[in-house]
């Protein structure tokens, strides 16, 4: 059943209808294309700026702020932002908002409690990022942190019964190889490093952060698929748990020091920039990625690695040697290959197979030729990245 005015209609429309039908898709396509490029720019800047800003804030001379307080402040701001967005969705009606939150958070308390697990892991992950970036160069961290793609893929296979293509498995192996080369370069020296840096602790923090990121992302995806709550509601619930759990972690790790020196000890404009980036960055990506496909996300990650490396050379005197360039290149290539939709991945695989020699493919008699992958609905099923799922849930 085709809708009226659908592009696939076989009826011959009148001249006016043809003109309208020809103009609207073109205008929509141009607007969508612009939004895709804006999405790419935003993703690149957000991916790179968070890492660089944390590194910059943690290496500034003077009093060093407490990382646990920054994590708590980011959760508070994120929760308040989601609350304002829900308030706007209720058209500024406080009564409707209160009734909605009472029903969604308190009455349906089972769904709320389910979010305690990913919230705990996300809070731990945010604290681990500070540990890792304080002990590793920003470019090294950015490359190594791409292991989260590997952990997310593995948890998706285990928890969601997803299947990966051969090209995706090969790209994961390529990713691991590239990260190993970068870490070998880091362990081998590569110039003097500050005395307060511990690359071993930084690597352990990155690996733990990648494991927690992969598990929490897939777990959160599973929750979103099994519930009807909006993305902003779920992020508000995450923010509530994140604030509470962050305060517990603050008290346990740095409670005495914070009580003595104050919650905002060591805060500078650079630190506030980190807090705002952490608070709004994830929400911004969740919205922006609606207009970006997985290829653009792969490009964004790859470009952010390049941007982080260039900025690290400029800001922190980072030295790029051939070993780092090789490892980073492998990671960038792996990210791009993994981000390809299944149809494109199969097309690349078939193209490489035909290029390796004469391909003798005999179609069984009586069977129709295989369908074109580019028109197959399965092309829309891409790799299990959480932001893509968020947009899918939003539109459902």
UniProtKB/Swiss-Prot annotation:
Result of changing residue 213 to F: In CDG2M; has no effect on localization to Golgi; partially rescues defective Gb3Cer expression in SLC35A2-deficient cells
Protein family: Belongs to the nucleotide-sugar transporter family. SLC35A subfamily.
Thylakoid keyword on record: no
Protein known as: UDP-galactose translocator
Motif range (ER retention motif): 392-396
Region Disordered, annotated ranges: 358-379
GO biological process: galactose metabolic process; UDP-galactose transmembrane transport
Any one Gene Ontology cellular component term annotated for this protein: endoplasmic reticulum membrane
Oligomeric form and interacting partners: Interacts with SLC35A3; the interaction is reduced in the presence of SLC35A4. Found in a complex with SLC35A3 and SLC35A4.
Recorded consequence of changing residue 145 to A: No effect on localization to Golgi apparatus
InterPro entries linked to this entry: Nuc_sug_transpt
Effect of residue 188 to S: In CDG2M; uncertain significance
Effect listed in the UniProt record for changing residue 142 to A: No effect on localization to Golgi apparatus
Effect ascribed to mutating residue 304 to P: Found in a patient with non-lesional focal epilepsy; uncertain significance; somatic mutation; able to rescue defective Gb3Cer expression in SLC35A2-deficient cells
Effect of residue 252 to C: In a breast cancer sample; somatic mutation
Effect of residue 297 to E: Does not rescue defective Gb3Cer expression in SLC35A2-deficient cells suggesting loss of UDP-galactose transport. No effect on localization to Golgi apparatus
Outcome of swapping residue 267 to C: Found in a patient with cerebral visual impairment; uncertain significance; able to rescue defective Gb3Cer expression in SLC35A2-deficient cells
Transmembrane regions: 3-23, 37-57, 65-85, 97-117, 140-160, 169-189, 200-220, 238-258, 269-289, 315-335
Role: Transports uridine diphosphate galactose (UDP-galactose) from the cytosol into the Golgi apparatus, functioning as an antiporter that exchanges UDP-galactose for UMP. It is also able to exchange UDP-galactose for AMP and CMP, and to transport UDP-N-acetylgalactosamine (UDP-GalNAc) and other nucleotide sugars. As a provider of UDP-galactose to galactosyltransferases present in the Golgi apparatus, it is necessary for globotriaosylceramide/globoside (Gb3Cer) synthesis from lactosylceramide.
């Amino acid at each position: 059943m085709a809708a009226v005015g659908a592009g696939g209609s076989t009826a011959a429309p009148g001249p006016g209808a043809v003109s309208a039908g020809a103009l609207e898709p073109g205008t929509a396509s141009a607007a969508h294309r612009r939004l895709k490029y804006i999405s790419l720019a935003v993703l690149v800047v957000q991916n790179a700026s968070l890492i660089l800003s944390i590194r910059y804030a943690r290496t500034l001379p003077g009093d060093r702020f407490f990382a646990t307080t920054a994590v708590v402040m980011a959760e508070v701001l994120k929760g308040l932002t989601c609350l304002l967005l829900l308030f706007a969705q209720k058209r500024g009606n406080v009564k409707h908002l209160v009734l909605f939150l009472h029903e969604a958070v308190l009455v349906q308390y089972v769904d709320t409690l389910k979010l305690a697990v990913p919230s705990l892991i996300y809070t731990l992950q945010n604290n681990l990022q500070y540990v890792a970036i304080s002990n590793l160069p920003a470019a090294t961290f950015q490359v190594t942190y791409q292991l989260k793609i590997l952990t997310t893929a593995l948890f998706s296979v285990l928890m969601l019964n997803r299947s990966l293509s051969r090209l995706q498995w090969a790209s994961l192996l390529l990713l691991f190889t590239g990260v190993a080369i970068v870490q070998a370069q880091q362990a081998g020296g590569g110039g003097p490093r500050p005395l307060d840096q511990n690359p071993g602790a930084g690597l352990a923090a990155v690996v733990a952060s990648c494991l927690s990121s992969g598990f929490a992302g897939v777990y959160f995806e599973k929750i979103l698929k099994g519930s009807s709550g909006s993305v902003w509601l779920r992020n508000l619930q995450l923010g509530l748990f994140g604030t509470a759990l962050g305060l517990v972690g603050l008290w346990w790790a740095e409670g005495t020091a914070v009580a003595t020196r104050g919650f905002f000890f060591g805060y500078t404009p650079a630190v506030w920039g980190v807090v705002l980036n952490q608070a709004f960055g994830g929400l911004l990506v969740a919205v922006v990625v609606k207009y970006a496909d997985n290829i653009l996300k792969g490009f964004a990650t790859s470009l952010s690695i390049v941007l982080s490396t260039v900025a690290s050379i400029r800001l922190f005197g980072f030295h790029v040697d051939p070993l780092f360039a090789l490892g980073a290149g492998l990671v960038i290539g792996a990210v791009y290959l993994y981000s390809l939709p299944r149809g494109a991945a199969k097309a690349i695989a078939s193209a490489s197979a035909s290029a390796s020699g004469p391909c003798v493919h005999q179609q069984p008699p009586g069977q129709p030729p295989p369908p074109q992958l580019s028109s197959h609905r399965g092309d829309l099923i891409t790799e299990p990245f959480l932001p893509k799922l968020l947009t899918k849930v939003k539109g459902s």
